[in-house]
A protein has these predicted regions:
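Flexible hinge/switch segments at interdomain interfaces of large molecular machines
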Residues: 30-34, 67-81, 111-116, 167-171, ...
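Short amphipathic alpha-helices in soluble, non-transmembrane regions
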Residues: 19-24, 49-59, 97-104, 130-139, ...
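Interaction-mediating elements
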Residues: 27-37, 52-53, 80-81, 85, ...
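Short glycine-/aliphatic-rich beta-strand segments at the starts of folded cytosolic domains
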Residues: 1-11, 35-40, 78-90, 119-120, ...
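Short, solvent-exposed interaction modules
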Residues: 59-111, 256
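Acidic (E/D-rich), amphipathic helical modules within compact regulatory domains
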Residues: 19-74
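Glycine/proline-enriched, intrinsically flexible loops and inter-domain linkers
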Residues: 91-93, 111, 117-130, 135-654
Length: 654
């Protein structure tokens, strides 16, 4: 049978209703709200329900159980018709569902599916317009939707269709290419699409949909830093500091000459040239250099019980501005989760984090929210909840938390996570995979949530509805990443790994595609969260908490067995080949076959001219007169307000 439960906290314990009411009264001052958790249990019999009802779902001391929402409404607001229910969109990870199903298995109740939601019941003095306001505030269409309480069914997923070939692509004129560009919603530029057309003309075939999407992802700004790799053809200084700037630029060019650098001037070169110079000249001797694309790494001496050992200290920062802007909780949680993945893929144990964020005024009236955006208050509060929840669950000491307030962040929020990790150097084996080696996918399963995350964060967003971005942000699963952290504490495991890459932006096509020059990936072996994903979605979904691990063929079974000891799924999904081609196979057909040399071009290099001018910013060194009025004005600024409440959400002493 199927059963629906409505769980409400007793008034003495109903903190969630109190908090929700206070929050919503910023929008509708006379609103009063009661919150219920909904559990839909599919395939459970009466005996099983009796066994688990008061163990997993209801605490008789603190909770009240209803089986019909009408009863819940009558008990709280008799005659009120102001209520609605919400649920996550199909395909979004729901930790409450996952935890409930695991608890059922622990009690030997198998075959039961759990789908949860929330019921919000309001006092009867609300107008339809006010109820609609509350509904729009509580439901973010990128992650959730209104739940129909008259229906109780498991969401169905469409059957995966074959990957189509883009007919007529190689013959397309510019107008046809522009239509293809618009139809596929590409983040690439038109000159990149023409470059792709030239490649497929040279091999005399049309690309598949997957090949075009993979290139759009692989060459995205998020994955390949195309903005920082843009060639700077001319620099013009128009500043009051011209002399100083010109001397600095000439010094930079001199350093390039000493290093023998012939590549074009780029922002990436400006950022890295001094590190290369100091390393080359022997000033800096502890930089750990490798072919892996993971975190920054330095070699440090560590005193272990009086013995000095060489360890790798690794650190990484990650921005999740776009994801947090559109889905604050998931965007901020996967900010720290994504930052952790980089040093973790470098085999480090991540032990420390910092968070710096930027927002406009969170006290702004919700009615003043810009069209197509979430209220600043909602973004700030839910982002703090998301980041702290993920870090606290994984067991990470977040030792610095700061939010900066400026109206400029209304255009785009800033969400920055920083982490540090360490590993004993002798445990890290770094070798280039060779033909015959195997690639193991370690960790979470793949879902539709995360398709387009890399290309989405690389686009210019003009007038998009939040609904259009629903697949680009995921909910993280900190518990799975914590298991990977534990697994990688085992020296036996680390010594099996020749090379490792985390599943960040781009999913399988990037994480496994980068690990060796020749790779053959069987997408049918990729574990799924649910049925219905097609080959394109399998190739580019960046579902969280996964690693691509290269091992020798003889070590596959050993690695998988060690992963199972940590309750981690590990599946061999790819082979390293010697043909310098990235090949992806789905349902026995090649849906991607791209030459490595073409893939490595990263598209058409962009060019730009730079004009350096002065901006009208307040002079930070200006000495203002100290008086009562200026002191009061300064203390009234948001950036001088106490952030203690936010800081205390983060565990800083794990």
């Amino acid at each position: 049978m199927n059963q629906r439960l409505f769980i409400q906290k007793k008034s003495e314990f109903d903190v969630i209703s109190q908090k929700t009411t206070i929050e919503l009264q910023n929008l509708v001052p006379h609103a009063v709200c009661k919150v219920f958790v909904i559990y839909d249990l599919f395939g459970i019999d009466e005996n099983q329900l009796a066994k688990v009802q008061n163990t997993i779902f209801v605490d008789p001391v603190t909770d009240i159980l209803y089986t019909h929402y009408e009863d819940a409404i009558v008990e709280n607001f008799p005659y009120s018709k102001n209520f609605f229910a919400t649920e996550f969109l199909p395909g979004q990870y729901n930790q409450r569902d996952d935890s409930a199903e695991q608890c059922l298995l622990l009690m030997n109740v198998e075959g039961v599916t759990v789908k949860s939601g929330m019921l919000y019941v309001f006092n009867g003095e609300l107008t339809n317009e006010e109820l609609l306001k509350l509904k729009e505030y509580l439901i973010n269409p990128i992650e959730s939707r209104e739940k129909d309480l008259s229906i109780m069914e498991i969401p169905s997923y469409p059957t995966a269709t074959e990957v189509p070939v883009i007919e007529g692509f190689v013959e397309a004129d510019e107008s046809k290419l522009k239509k293809i560009y618009a139809d596929f919603g590409l983040s690439l530029e038109m000159d990149d699409l023409k470059f792709i057309q030239e490649y497929f003309q040279s091999i005399k075939r049309n690309p598949t949909e997957t090949e075009l999407k993979v290139l759009d992802t692989y060459w995205s700004d998020h994955c390949r830093h195309t903005t920082f790799e843009t060639e700077i053809t001319d620099v013009d200084f128009q500043s009051k500091f011209n002399t100083t700037l010109q001397k600095t630029f000439e010094y930079y060019q001199k350093i390039r000459q000493e290093l023998g650098t012939t590549k074009p001037i780029r922002l990436m070169d400006l950022a890295t040239v001094m590190g290369k110079y100091l390393s080359r000249t022997g000033v800096v001797k502890n930089i750990d250099v490798s072919e892996e694309i993971n975190a920054c790494s330095i070699v440090v001496p560590i005193d272990i019980d009086g013995e000095e050992e060489e360890w790798l200290l690794q650190f990484k920062n990650e921005t999740h501005n776009h994801p947090t802007e559109v889905e604050p909780y998931g965007g901020a949680s996967t900010c720290v989760g994504g930052a952790i993945r980089d040093p973790l893929s470098g085999r480090s144990y991540v032990f420390q984090a910092m968070r710096i964020s930027g927002a406009a005024n969170p006290l702004e009236k919700i009615d003043n929210t810009l069209p197509g955006k979430l209220p600043q208050r909602k973004i700030s509060k839910e982002a703090a909840n998301g980041y702290s929840s993920y870090g606290n669950q994984i067991g990470l000491a977040t030792t610095f938390v700061k939010e900066i307030y400026d109206e400029g962040y209304k255009a785009k929020r800033m969400e920055v996570g920083f982490v540090a990790g360490a590993v004993k150097k002798e445990y890290v084996r770094r070798e280039e995979p060779v033909a015959g080696d195997k690639i193991i996918l370690l960790g979470g399963a793949t879902g539709r949530d995360g398709v387009g995350g890399a290309s989405g964060s690389s686009k210019t967003h003009d007038g998009l509805d939040l609904d259009d971005l629903s697949a680009e942000v995921q909910k993280g699963n900190a518990i799975v990443e914590r298991k990977i952290q534990r697994l990688f504490r085992n020296p036996e495991v680390l010594k099996l790994i020749k090379k490792c890459n985390d599943f960040g932006a781009g999913g399988v096509s990037v994480a496994i595609g980068e690990i060796a020059r020749g790779i053959y990936i069987d997408l049918d072996k990729v574990p799924l969260k649910y049925a219905g994903l097609n080959g394109t979605e399998l190739a580019i979904s960046e579902s969280q908490e996964r690693m691509a691990v290269a091992v020798e063929a003889k070590d596959v079974d050993t690695f998988i067995a060690l992963a199972k000891e940590e309750n981690l799924d590990a599946t061999c999904v790819a082979d390293v080949t010697d043909d310098e081609t990235m090949t992806l196979v789905w349902r026995g057909k090649k849906i991607v076959e791209i030459d490595r040399k073409f893939l490595d071009t990263n598209g058409v290099r962009k060019q730009a001219k730079v004009i350096v001018t002065d901006e009208e910013y307040p002079n930070p060194f200006e000495q203002k007169e100290f008086n009562k009025e200026q002191f009061i004005q300064m203390m009234q600024e948001l950036n001088h307000a106490s952030q203690k409440g936010m800081v205390e959400m983060f565990d800083n002493n794990v």
